[in-house]
Amino acid sequence: MNISTTRKDFMIVNMGPHHPSMHGVLRLIVTLDGEDVIDCEPILGYLHRGMEKIAENRTIIQYLPYVTRWDYLATMFTEAITVNGPEQLGNIQVPKRASYIRVIMLELSRIASHLLWLGPFMADIGAQTPFFYIFRERELIYDLFEAATGMRMMHNFFRIGGVATDLPYGWVDKCYDFCDYFLTRIVEYQKLITRNPIFLERVEGVGVVDIKEVINWGLSGPMLRASGIQWDLRKVDNYECYEEFDWEVQWQKEGDSLARYLVRIGEMMESIKIIQQALEGIPGGPYENLEIRCFDREKEPEWNEFEYRFISKKPSPTFELPKQELYVRIEAPKGELGIFLIGDQNGFPWRWKIRPPGFINLQILPQLVKRMKLADIMTILGSIDIIMGEVDR
């Protein structure tokens, strides 16, 4: 008769690659001792598309449609960083109206990104209802995007020196209505989630990061502010026209998954405040600085030359990048999104290095999940908020 014995060696479990609709195609190799996590190794690269190398073979205008595929849930921010770099290198002035439109679009995109973080995060820890609620509000934001840009996602709206089109008639009133409605929905979320005892049991004290670790790991965004550091690039760098608005940096000092949730909920309310102020104070004037459009050619072509024989050969505007280096950054929903740009006195960047917030924040995951339970992995991973498009690039 065979007597069954208890196995005492560690078990290695593959979590993932996850479905793209959740956290992206991330694979975790987890070493378990029963329910306890001994080690965790993230495996990246399933969504690598060579975005940095593609940038070296495209003009900025040609590259704009590519960048919306980094963080495909907050595409306005990747567009903003792509045009901000050449604008600063070339000392290009952005009209005031265009800057206000950009801020409105960025903050709407921030709310949409946080909403699509909140739903799957709650689903990860067992609450299904918020997952359906958040799509109700997110749909309204996408309706606004569609009215202004023509696209619900992958907007391709930002241009060097401004934006592609002006806001359509009646759009501002629609946006006002959305802001008033969304504030009531935020209150509903807080009643439903924030004091829920089951939710608190799953997130309070789970995945704690202290101030020293946050700085050493180079974390940013809600991960940084949830650990007691009031650092928001909208206040620090004053890019676009954020210094003209009255709003507060959202932060907590506990550093756990609950603190990160509270920071993001607070940020959605602050974004509404910024949008309302921008809608009230939006000035008139041009929406794009058309004077800085220059064509990279030595002479004007003749009417019978080869270039004019095909309509597809009509040249797009190209912007010559000076021979300089520049690091430009903005506060994306997930943290500091930066680009290190080297110009080479032509239309193509010599180097285009992306600093994605999700990739940096994901590094601390193995340390956070060690000595935790298996069920806590999804709670901690969800609270970090990653999108594999920008992690793998």
From Swiss-Prot:
Its EC number is 7.1.1.-. It catalyses: a plastoquinone + NADH + (n+1) H(+)(in) = a plastoquinol + NAD(+) + n H(+)(out); a plastoquinone + NADPH + (n+1) H(+)(in) = a plastoquinol + NADP(+) + n H(+)(out). The keyword GTP-binding does not apply. It is found in: Plastid, Chloroplast thylakoid membrane. Pfam families: Complex1_49kDa (PF00346). One of its GO terms (biological process) is photosynthesis, light reaction. It is a peripheral membrane protein. Coiled coil: none annotated. One of its GO terms (molecular function) is oxidoreductase activity, acting on NAD(P)H, quinone or similar compound as acceptor. The keyword Glycoprotein does not apply. One of its GO terms (cellular component) is chloroplast thylakoid membrane. Signal peptide: none annotated. Its main location: plastid. Gene3D superfamilies: Cytochrome-c3 Hydrogenase, chain B. It comes from the Eukaryota. Keywords: Chloroplast, Membrane, NAD, NADP, Plastid, Plastoquinone, Quinone, Thylakoid, Translocase, Transport. NDH shuttles electrons from NAD(P)H:plastoquinone, via FMN and iron-sulfur (Fe-S) centers, to quinones in the photosynthetic chain and possibly in a chloroplast respiratory chain. The immediate electron acceptor for the enzyme in this species is believed to be plastoquinone. Couples the redox reaction to proton translocation, and thus conserves the redox energy in a proton gradient. Belongs to the complex I 49 kDa subunit family. NDH is composed of at least 16 different subunits, 5 of which are encoded in the nucleus. PANTHER family: NADH DEHYDROGENASE [UBIQUINONE] IRON-SULFUR PROTEIN 2, MITOCHONDRIAL (PTHR11993:SF10), NADH-UBIQUINONE OXIDOREDUCTASE 49 KDA SUBUNIT (PTHR11993). This is NAD(P)H-quinone oxidoreductase subunit H, chloroplastic. It comes from Glycine max.
